[in-house]
């Protein structure tokens, strides 16, 4: 600014003076009273006129308490220096309030990725790592924990801003098929919290209703479920003491589903062969790193590779009695077993659940537990002598028809270990909220609610009956050898095996529970309930987070061809060795 000297009549003039405001040096305009004969240094006349005009319009105001102590007083609408805000998570310079907390761009992006991709992390320390700017990437588990503790909300992660490729794959909805149940253990409260869903109004990004014929997902992605969970144990479940790899069997199921999809898409897709590591990378969508547990995953995929490479020739050596039946012969000699339908080792059904339960239990934990139960049920069925005398095609048909019934019996047997009641209660709460917010149609909610009620009623009844391991084994055998499913070959042989199982169960009840005369009939009367449960809804509740719209019965042939030794080895390795979550 040009400076001039003035010796005119007294006027109001201004000058620039540096003062301290909030520990910062700021240049301010100071009003100076002049008098005749006094020479002062002032700003140019044009600037002074503009300042006087602003003052007259009451836009600026100055006070002078002496030349050395002048201070500026601005109106509320005026811009004033702002203190620098720090990220509540790592202490870096904050860029604003994101998802409910003052945070930097780094923590904002980290939280968004973690919620959108449903990533789970593990802490290599004591879950109390210090999170600062320079080491915030060292422990993602503690960083995510601190994000939540500082007030970041997962339901604020907007679905409509998700990557374009994700939106293209799931038109009209954010969820591929089912809500990502993301369970959080509230470490601040010593009490068990009621399982509740945080509604996904922000996540939905539109109406969740879909036309009939499309399998509509039940929930939105990234929804948090507040649950204080304590480790549970059950006689029917074996729980490991170390953090197991939650990706192994779930990844196998996903890989089978993806492989089946590629086969259906055409030769150009199905002819491409992926190694186990490449397959895992495809499952992870190229952006989820597997930290540790590589040996466990490789062993599981080795078993998968053997199953996929098994040719029809390997099945020719099976003791099959179906070929003659399919050849048109109406008189087929039935096979008689020299031993009972079940032996002592068939009574054992030990499900190894992922343990310990992490503080942040995402959908992979639930799907992994369900995958293990599915594998265990199928390989248990394969071990039955009566099952082994049938052909491979009959194996596939039988299991495809009744996999949901076998799975439900397994859920009832391992309900405590899987915390089934907690999961179902949370889903019911969310369905009620979705109905109130018009996110799901009333018919859709009614169908799922009825399914859950039937499932819970079945589990509760078996619990009240105190069904033991042997009784569960015989009930599964009776369900497996059901001759009334359409499309089965050699129905007479299957019916014969079912009659043997019923007879052996009757003898067991008479010997073990002689005073409970109605126990045998009560057990058999529970089986019709299994036919009322929808396999499609069962897939959606427990598997859709893994395989989307692929049906379980499409991957059953691959699972049945897996070698039992490989499956058992993968299970043992996962139980004995610590692993990590996909994240």
Curated annotation (Swiss-Prot):
It comes from the Eukaryota. A zinc finger (NR C4-type) spans 87-107, 123-142. It is found in: Cytoplasm; Nucleus. Disulfide bonds: none annotated. Expressed uniformly in the early embryo. In contrast, larval expression is localized to the epaulettes and mouth epithelium. Expressed in multiple adult organs including lantern muscle, tubefeet, intestine, coelomocytes and gonads. In the adult ovaries and testes, expression is specifically localized to the smooth muscle epithelial layer of cells which surround the ovarioles and acini, respectively (at protein level). GO terms for biological process: cell differentiation; regulation of transcription by RNA polymerase II. Residues 248-563 form the NR LBD domain. Binds DNA as a monomer. Orphan nuclear receptor. Binds to the hormone response element in the upstream promoter region of the CYIIIB gene in vitro. Both isoform 1 and isoform 2 bind DNA. This is Orphan steroid hormone receptor 2. The gene is SHR2.
